[in-house]
């Protein structure tokens, strides 16, 4: 059985305050996009995880897909399986690829083995793996708050726009991005701003991580500027980077950006 875990982008990201547990409270809109991995699950003699495509750093035994399997196996009698992940979503990009893979595995296990778990139960499993994992269970636009693990549905449809995603050959440390953050009050609530057309977002919908990341990585700032110069109605870094997306009102190509970056069109 195979499924295709998709990426997400963050539209606006406000760091609200620092919590007593040293995490931060934030507000952001998460929006699913069509850039996808491929995830296959088959029964096997022994539990096994393999991958292809983009090389996944670290020990494969620490992969979030295996973590999801073990989490569900602790509550349900599951047979050994072979999990194969073909990685296409860039890693360390602020696109939630690893979280999506783990959440889609939860959905795969639920379907393949007839567990008949509700979305809320699967969200509970996913939230134990990572703060944004539960988003990918329902996989529709939400306003996320708290640590980024509490969600409220919103109406947002960008299907009439052309989205371009740019991934530079850079890695941004999320911890380092947080260290450079200056917490500032917001003048208008993000859910209110989502009632505006994307053409009105440029000077109002901000990603707070850009203030700490752009000075250290001017190449990422340059990508955002290039997207606007090419006609994007809105452009932003996703999450803590390093990817940047542009929302265009018509199909476009960006050969200048293709020379040094991965560029994904029509996501």
Where in this protein do the model-derived segments appear?
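Contiguous, small/hydrophobic- and glycine-enriched helical/loop subdomains that border
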Residues: 102, 106-143
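Conserved, helical-rich catalytic subdomain that frames metal- and/or nucleotide-binding sites
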Residues: 49, 138, 143-234, 249-259, ...
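Residue-level signal for inorganic ion chemistry
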Residues: 11, 39-41, 65, 98, ...
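Short beta-strand scaffold segments in enzyme catalytic cores
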Residues: 13, 37-41, 132-136, 142, ...
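ATP-binding N-lobe of GHMP and related small-molecule kinases
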Residues: 1-93, 111-120, 155-157, 167
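Glycine/serine-rich anion-binding loops at beta->alpha junctions
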Residues: 84-113, 131, 233-245
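Solvent-exposed alpha-helices and their adjacent loops that cap or buttress functional pockets
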Residues: 31-32, 127-128, 134-137, 155-159, ...
